[in-house]
Design a protein with these regions (language model features):
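Core catalytic alpha/beta fold that binds nucleotide/phospho-ligands
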Residues: 1-220
């Protein structure tokens, strides 16, 4: 059985940024110098600390994991065999994922966007029909349910978002989300809350043991 570990948090703006910066590695602090947006700096720091927590609690004690960038710029785990990572942040929400197979995670909260136009461009006919059947007030969250699945799946496949969003579709008519077509190689998990949606994907044909935990920001 494949193990998949997820930690996520909702930011607390009352907590000072320095609280999170103090726990970063020298490499993280060096990468952080490229950011100017305060909210981006904050979410970057929190995502790296969540990942640190996952690595420390889930990997063998003797493991010496390191982060590296692939040729495409994707963040990857080095120094340990058979483990994969994914990060997501936005709208004050941050999530980190560690899995024994290629993985992707996305967490999204409500925000102003032209979601109908995005759906018309990236959603399949079946997805658009399902979206149209939802109550008007439920439209934004229904959109996020599909969008987060697409983002998580594309990340798990290691492909570019823009070029592959429209090439995959999902069925949300059942109890659990399913990828339409050839879906045997991907396991999906989605959690829907009043103020956000979290979706995760793992590239495997085996059953997945999901470990999902919300960590209060003041415990990071």
């Amino acid at each position: 059985m494949i193990q998949a570990h997820i930690l996520w948090l909702r930011d607390d703006p009352a907590l000072p940024l320095e609280r999170f910066l103090s726990g970063l590695s020298a490499a993280d602090l060096s990468e952080l110098k490229h950011f100017r947006d305060p909210s981006r700096i904050r979410s970057f720091a929190q995502s790296r600390l969540l990942l640190q927590r996952l690595l420390a609690s889930s990997l063998p004690p003797h493991a010496t994991p390191m982060l590296e960038r692939t040729v495409s710029g994707r963040l990857a785990l080095a120094g340990v065999h058979g483990w994969h990572i994914s990060l997501s942040h936005g709208s004050g929400l941050v999530a980190a994922m560690l899995s024994e197979a290629g993985c992707g995670i996305d967490i999204e909260g409500p925000r102003k966007m032209a979601w109908q136009k995005i759906a018309n461009r990236y959603f399949s006919a079946g997805e658009q029909n399902w979206l149209a059947q939802q109550e008007a007030k439920a439209g934004p969250q229904a959109f996020l349910r599909l969008w987060t699945l697409k983002e998580a799946a594309v990340k798990a496949m290691g492909k570019g978002l823009a070029n592959h969003m429209a090439s995959m579709a999902f069925d949300l008519s059942g109890k659990h989300p399913q990828r339409t077509g050839d879906s045997a190689d991907m396991a999906l998990r989605q959690e829907i809350r009043e103020d956000h949606v979290l979706a995760a994907a793992v590239m495997t044909q085996e059953p997945v043991n999901w470990h999902i935990e919300c960590l209060p920001a003041d415990q990071l």
